[in-house]
């Protein structure tokens, strides 16, 4: 097979990875292995970094932390050599989330901040917003509310400057939910209510089921704390109906607990 034919095959593998990631772990890993073999044979560092990253991401989704870290560690060096900065930032984000899940807050903080530095240095705005939301959540979960609010507000500011409507709504929704939760944890229910109103006014028309689930969990807690049990029960009923649609509730497990 000539060079052009080989490139076509590799591009097809890469597209298969991008199409199947998060949907079909076995197929994604098979394609990554094909790419890895080809990249090693042809000494293609960029391609090998791509394969290791998406293998690591897939193992993360499978909750296989050992294989995730092994692949991501191999990916980072190669991604740095070949200037794939967004994948590096995403790598640090994945390692941070996994560290949080393992209870290693200090390691998670280091990974988040390193990822944030790459985002700021290379202008990776979308990933920067995600990491700021995650950092804010880490501070919030540990009771450092002022720092949490600072990151949520920075993320909100970035979202406001993003012209893409869909991405803008996703970021805004996350910012509003996180700020509402942060104020609610501090007992500042008037400010919580203000952000719930912003969610309804600015984001509701874009909601998908998973978004409604996040917001309903927030509202149910708020109505419980304000002793509005009729509205609380209505939100809980809506949550039950959405869960019965087989929404992936692990994505919002903390909110449901």
Regions inferred by a protein language model and the residue ranges of each:
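Solenoidal tandem-repeat scaffolds enriched in leucines and small polar residues
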Residues: 105-108, 115-191, 208-209
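Amphipathic coiled-coil alpha-helices
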Residues: 12-13, 31, 52, 71, ...
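Helix-coil-helix junctions within alpha-helical repeat/solenoid scaffolds
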Residues: 184-257
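Conserved alpha-helical positions within TPR/SEL1-like repeat arrays
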Residues: 14-21, 50-61, 86-101, 126-141, ...
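Flexible inter-repeat linkers and adjacent short helices
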Residues: 1-88
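Amphipathic alpha-helical segments of tetratricopeptide repeats
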Residues: 33-40, 73-83, 113-124, 153-164, ...
């Amino acid at each position: 097979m000539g060079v052009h034919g080989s490139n076509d095959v590799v591009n097809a593998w890469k597209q298969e990875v991008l199409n199947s990631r998060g949907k079909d772990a076995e197929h994604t890993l098979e394609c990554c292995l094909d790419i890895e073999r080809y990249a090693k044979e042809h000494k293609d560092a960029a391609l090998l970094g791509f394969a290791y990253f998406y293998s690591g991401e897939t193992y993360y989704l499978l909750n296989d932390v050992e294989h995730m870290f092994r692949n991501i560690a191999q990916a980072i060096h190669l991604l740095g050599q070949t200037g794939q900065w967004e994948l590096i930032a995403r790598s640090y984000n994945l390692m941070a989330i996994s560290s949080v899940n393992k209870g290693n807050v200090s390691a998670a903080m280091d990974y988040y901040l390193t990822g944030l530095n790459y985002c700021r240095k290379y202008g990776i705005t979308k990933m920067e917003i995600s990491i700021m939301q995650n950092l804010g959540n880490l501070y919030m979960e540990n009771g450092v509310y002022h720092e949490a609010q600072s990151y949520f507000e920075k993320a909100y500011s970035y979202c406001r400057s993003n012209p893409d409507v869909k991405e803008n709504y996703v970021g805004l929704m996350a910012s509003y939910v996180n700020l509402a939760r942060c104020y609610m944890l501090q007992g500042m229910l008037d400010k919580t209510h203000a952000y719930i109103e912003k969610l309804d006014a600015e984001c509701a028309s874009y909601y998908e089921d998973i978004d409604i689930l996040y917001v309903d969990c927030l509202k149910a807690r708020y109505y419980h704390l304000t002793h509005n049990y009729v509205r609380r029960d209505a939100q809980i009923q809506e949550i039950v109906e959405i869960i019965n649609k087989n929404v992936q509730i692990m994505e919002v497990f903390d909110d449901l607990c």
